[in-house]
Structure formats: C-alpha cells, structure tokens
C-alpha cells in the first residue's frame, strides 16, 4: 500500500488535505478530500497538474498531468487527462469531505502523481463538454486559489 497527501495552501482562505492510497500497481487509487473555506453550496474543480513547482504560487504547477496526450474530460471518460478529477461539492459553509476511486491516478510506476501538484480551482469543471475554448484543455475551471504538492505519507 502506497499513501500520499497534498496539504492545500494558497492565496485564499481555502485549506485542507487530499489523500491518495493505492494497494498495488494495478489497483485503482482512492482519492479522499477534506477541504474548507471554498464557496458555499458549489461544485468546484480539482486536478493533478504536471509539476510539483509552487514557487510562483499555484500557477507554477503547469498544465494538467497528461502523459498520454489526451483531451480534457470527466473522471469516468476514456479520453481524459490522468489529472482530471472532476468536481467536488461544498456544503453551506464551503466545506467538502468525500472520496472516489480513480483507475488512471497512480502512485506506483512511470505515470505516478507523486511530486506533482493537486490544484483546487475557483470554478466548476465543465468536463470538456462546452464550446468554451478552454473546455478541452482545462475544463474552463478558472483560477487556482489553493494547491499542494503530492508527497509520500506515513
């Protein structure tokens, strides 16, 4: 079992953690989140981005992690970036707790997300389904108010 965590920080009141657990190289990864301080009663995007570089805030993380050269999509789509995690829902206080399993997110192997950045976005991911020019690249998910590098956890 490999475990990892991203501790979220940024230029906003958003904070929290996103954890990852993978039993072996062929197993799906469980992604769990506990996020506070976002917009109330909203769907907000989160993605794994290419770089673990946060020297200029979350913008330094680069584009979505996309080792297979696919278009942006929903987590359940065949054609999607590895880093496309979709949206999480916040409650009336702007907090979100949840988990999902993902077959493309890996902690083991050449396409591992370890050392990359988990980014929380200001907007909702359109899952690559709109006519907006950013839809097939970013899901038109907006600014990056919080992020954290994915590191190995105890």
Curated annotation (Swiss-Prot):
UniProt subcellular location: Cytoplasm
Reaction(s) catalysed (UniProt annotation): 2 superoxide + 2 H(+) = H2O2 + O2
Top-rank taxon, per record: Eukaryota
Comp. bias regions, Basic and acidic residues: 125-137
InterPro entries reported in the protein's UniProt record: SOD-like_Cu/Zn_dom_sf, SOD_Cu/Zn_/chaperone, SOD_Cu/Zn_BS, SOD_Cu_Zn_dom
Gene3D superfamilies: Superoxide dismutase, copper/zinc binding domain
Cofactor: Cu cation; Zn(2+)
Binding positions (Cu cation): 47, 49, 64, 121
BP term (GO), one: copper ion transport
EC code(s) of this entry: 1.15.1.1
Keyword annotations: Antioxidant, Copper, Cytoplasm, Disulfide bond, Metal-binding, Oxidoreductase, Zinc
UniProt keyword annotation of Cytoplasm present: yes
Note on how the cofactor is bound: Binds 1 copper ion per subunit.
Location of the region described as Disordered in the Swiss-Prot/TrEMBL record: 125-144
Function: Destroys radicals which are normally produced within the cells and which are toxic to biological systems.
PANTHER family from the UniProt entry: SUPEROXIDE DISMUTASE CU-ZN -RELATED
Complex formation: Homodimer.
Protein name from the UniProt record: Superoxide dismutase [Cu-Zn]
UniProt lineage: Eukaryota, Fungi, Dikarya, Ascomycota, Pezizomycotina
